[in-house]
Amino acid sequence: MEQSVDSLKVNHNDSEESKTDSQHLTYMDSSEPSFGQDGSPRVLPVTTPEEDGSLTSQNIPGPLTQAQILSAEQFHLVDQNGQPVQYELQSLGDSNAQMMIVASPSENGQVLRVIPSPQTGMTQVIIPQGPLVDENSPQDVSEEKPSDRNLPAVRVDALADSNSSYVLHPQASLTLPKKTVTRILEEPLLAPLQPLSSNTPIWACRLRSCEKIGDSYRGYCVSETELESVLTFHKQQTQSVWGTRQSPSPAKPATRLMWKSQYVPYDGIPFVNAGSRAVVMECQYGPRRKGFQLKKIGELENRSCQLYKATCPARIYIKKVQKFPDYRVPTDPKIDRKIIRMEQEKAFNLLKKNLVDAGGVLRWYVQLPTQQAHQYHELETPCLPLSSSSFPISSLEEEEAAIRDENCTLPSRLHPQVAHKIQELVSQGIEQVYAVRKQLRKFVERELFKPDEVPERHNLSFFPTVNDIRNHIHEVQKSLRNGDNICNSEIIPATLQWTTDSGNILRETVTVTLAEGNSQGESVSSKLETNQTRNSLSPEPAQLLSSLSSFQPKIFTHLQGLQLQPRFTSDGSPALISVNNHPSSSPSRLLDSVRSVVMNNNSLLLGQTHCLQTDTPLTPNSSISSTMSNLPGPDQNLVAVDQLVEVEDVEDTETLEGNVHRILLGNVQTIPIQIIDNPPVLSNFGSILKEPIFDCFGGPIKI
């Protein structure tokens, strides 16, 4: 070891020849006569350009002309992560000592200081800990290849190791750790892939190579500090709270080379994943968090079907990768794809051989949602609009804008007809998410659009995601649970009045329902549903009928295919049937009687509902508008007829009292029925069958 008193001096090069505004750590030998005077100190080649914030290696030939007295503002020091280091410059009282740099701890807890050595013949430098590599060896020298960005390296001529510090001798220099060197390279701020609009959020402008994807912005950061800064600024600007849904597991390092992935766009630079999984952060109103909470837990228990809660779909995705810019391939679309494919294979083969020593830079790709991506933050505000029956297909954008403005505070990206189809399916009992999605796809591709006009599958307005379908199912279930009518009044036609023209009653389809009373003398409310006679079902009644069948399936499961067979007397006149109530009738028998009289294969026509009171008896000359004859007794029969077309009066007979009506069942012959007002000769068991009625199998039907 040379016996000379050495010291380190910090000097700043302001000459015009240096175009990188670099700072140099200069070395002076105190044994020389020029020590302490304006001489020509030897320079340790350490430069820190301030443009891109990276440490570069430059061998500076020739001595400096003059040492300058500097202030702290003239220096820019960075640690091994490329982050600025706070420091101070202090002059020591000893004349032999020049400067002392005191640096604060860096981000990873390491300390960088330059101090005078208490020993003679050496200068002690404490640097970030890490293995030092002698780049004079043939293997390391071959690694140094010219590129646009010079690697930060300083040649080593002699190196002696002390316990906790590294000792530099004259004509010696320091080599930075090689693995650390490859990770402190910072890239200049590249232009975005596509021009951003003027209303781009400020936090999105801080991302490198930023691009807009739907309601999110995607870009990358080159350091964890930059990433944290962007995330913090995004949270402040959007006023959102996030929780981590998924974190990378501490698995072994990934070695699979890739050109692009779900989180990393293609830019011609190969990379490997630095983590096993991406970091996924969800909104505080997302799944497994708040969302739409039911006020009463008991309501959940009373429901047999599975309920879904509406949750916010906003997500933040962070993916850490290691890029290899030295193996970049051209991305010009004019170049033949075969040439690009050959270049990619060549780059992969080289990387597989030198993957450990290939270097590279770290990037954190981030996808941040905008405020429009958040939904379902207000617990009491319904966000899914109830669609109307008529939807003009001409202008979809204006239609969706009107829905947003009028019906909800937070927009639903589903098209109104798609949302209405979900309501229809749920009302029919189809509540499985994937079953609903299958029906929606058939509806859009076969009914809503022509085969050559079907939109793309990524159009979420017509092909919603599973999460959107769950949210809409939840809204429909909530409406059904609260007793809201999910069928719009516009679907059901206006009130149809039964009027007579020249004494003739209009031919209409009639369905009469008599509910069972609770006690004697209590008025029983009934429903009378009418519609114009037609050969086939219209879509609206068919929809309502299917909804009723899903709610009360037991009513429609008995005696299918039965048909009334009218019997005639020997003289050809229609037989008379006397009908009375059964005092001992039960709800189950009433339900069975409903199905027993639904005969024909023609579908039941349903229309506008009218409530009928049983207070006023039906007379032969009265119009059937809002009343119906009162059947005696405490219990009423539940009667349903497929096609009741005509009600007329017949002449009174000597043995039967009251009014006799004929009921025409579609194209079949009329069957006269007489309703007797509690004659004294009848027993409590009610009805008197003057002529039996048989079903299509020849069996008698009990009334």
UniProtKB/Swiss-Prot annotation:
The lineage of its organism: Eukaryota, Metazoa, Chordata, Craniata, Vertebrata. This is Calcium-responsive transcription factor. GO terms for cellular component: nucleus. The keyword Heme does not apply. It comes from Bos taurus. Residues 23-34 have a biased composition (Polar residues). Acts as a transcriptional activator that mediates the calcium- and neuron-selective induction of BDNF exon III transcription. Binds to the consensus calcium-response element CaRE1 5'-CTATTTCGAG-3' sequence. Disulfide bonds: none annotated. It is found in: Nucleus. GO terms for molecular function: DNA binding; DNA-binding transcription activator activity, RNA polymerase II-specific; DNA-binding transcription factor activity, RNA polymerase II-specific; RNA polymerase II cis-regulatory region sequence-specific DNA binding. The N-terminus is necessary for DNA-binding. The C-terminus is necessary for transcriptional activation.
